[in-house]
């Protein structure tokens, strides 16, 4: 009579090791002692159980938290766009007109939590002004994280009575993150000769240089439309917007416009911008893009296609829209 195959006993041992590891919570060293095998053998038994399909791991979102936790969408966004991390904000009720900081409270809280987790004390953090970054600064918690300096990435001075929030962001981040502030005392756009003159100014040139080499950059995104912050703040008019759109512009970061593939749109306006160039944004290893609202969908998709962000914080509607695109 033929000797019985050793395979069933091998599987029994693998199943036993997997049960002790996944269900009973034992370490590999404890499993090795329990089964009378070496620690490497215990590890191989657990791996064999997984390889043979004896282990099924299921991550379950509690039913009462399904409106606030979106792990599946986050994972798919990371895989689809090659992101370091995606955070989909919960369904907290935000009260406020579109474009106002209150309308970004949920993504602001989520982005603040992500930022505090990613910051290290030696980092220089750059930001672009806007309601999204105002919401982030508002949501920062004292004593959780720190960085070396906070630098303004785009000019904010304007003749219009428009509140950019740049001073609030600088002051709040400096206080909460115990950081040095580096202001950019310049307008967002100026004529080319003025821009050239400003670049020779030691304060402005040092600020732009610090921004270009920031370890962390956090920014909202603007649409190339009258729904954008730049139009609302009178930095652009309809004629300028029409020209940008005719050249393929779909969105902007720091006043610098890009097309549907996230590539810079080279116009006369680009020569007038006083802000960190998009190539420096793309080169930064920790870029956090905040997106919320239907008006930002196409610009967000373009920025992700162009690898202008490594980390994304968005609302669930934006996440689902992005995942529906091909």
For each predicted feature, which ranges?
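Conserved beta-strand segments of alpha/beta enzyme cores
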Residues: 84-87, 149, 180-182
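Conserved phosphate- and dinucleotide-binding cores of soluble alpha/beta proteins
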Residues: 2-18, 22-31, 36, 41, ...
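HTH-adjacent hinge/linker in prokaryotic transcriptional regulators
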Residues: 8, 44-124, 138-145, 158-163
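Conserved S-adenosyl-L-methionine
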Residues: 143-148, 306-308
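Glycine-rich beta-strand-to-loop/alpha-helix junction loops that act as flexible
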Residues: 89-90, 126-132, 292, 316
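Residues that mark the start of a beta-strand
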Residues: 122-124, 149, 286
């Amino acid at each position: 009579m033929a000797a019985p195959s050793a395979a069933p006993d091998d599987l029994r041992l693998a199943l036993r090791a997997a049960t002790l590891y996944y269900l009973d919570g034992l370490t590999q060293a404890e499993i090795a002692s329990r089964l009378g095998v070496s620690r490497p053998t215990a590890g191989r038994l657990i791996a064999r159980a997984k390889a043979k399909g004896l282990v099924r791991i299921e991550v379950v979102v509690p039913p009462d938290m399904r409106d606030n936790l979106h792990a599946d969408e986050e994972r798919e966004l990371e895989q689809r766009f090659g992101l370091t991390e995606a955070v989909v904000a919960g369904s907290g009720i935000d009260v406020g007109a579109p474009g106002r900081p209150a309308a970004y409270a949920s993504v602001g809280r989520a982005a603040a939590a992500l930022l505090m987790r990613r910051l290290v004390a030696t980092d220089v953090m750059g930001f672009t002004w806007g309601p999204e970054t105002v919401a982030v600064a508002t949501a920062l918690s004292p004593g959780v994280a720190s960085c070396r300096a906070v630098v303004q990435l785009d000019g904010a001075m304007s003749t219009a009575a428009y509140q950019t929030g740049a001073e609030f962001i600088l002051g709040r981040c400096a206080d909460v993150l115990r950081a040095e502030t580096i202001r950019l005392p310049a307008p967002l756009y100026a004529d080319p000769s003025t821009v050239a003159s400003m670049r020779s100014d030691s304060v402005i040139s040092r600020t732009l240089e610090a921004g270009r080499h920031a370890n962390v950059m956090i920014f909202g995104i603007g649409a190339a439309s009258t729904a954008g912050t730049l139009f609302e703040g009178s930095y652009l008019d309809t004629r300028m917007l029409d020209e940008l759109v005719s050249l393929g512009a779909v969105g902007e970061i720091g006043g610098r416009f890009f097309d549907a593939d996230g590539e810079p749109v080279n116009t006369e306006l680009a020569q007038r911008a006083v802000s960190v160039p998009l190539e420096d944004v793309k080169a930064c290893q920790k870029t956090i893009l905040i997106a919320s609202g239907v008006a930002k969908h196409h610009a967000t998709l373009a920025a992700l296609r162009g690898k202008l962000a490594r980390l994304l914080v968005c609302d669930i509607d934006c996440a689902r829209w992005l995942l529906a695109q091909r």
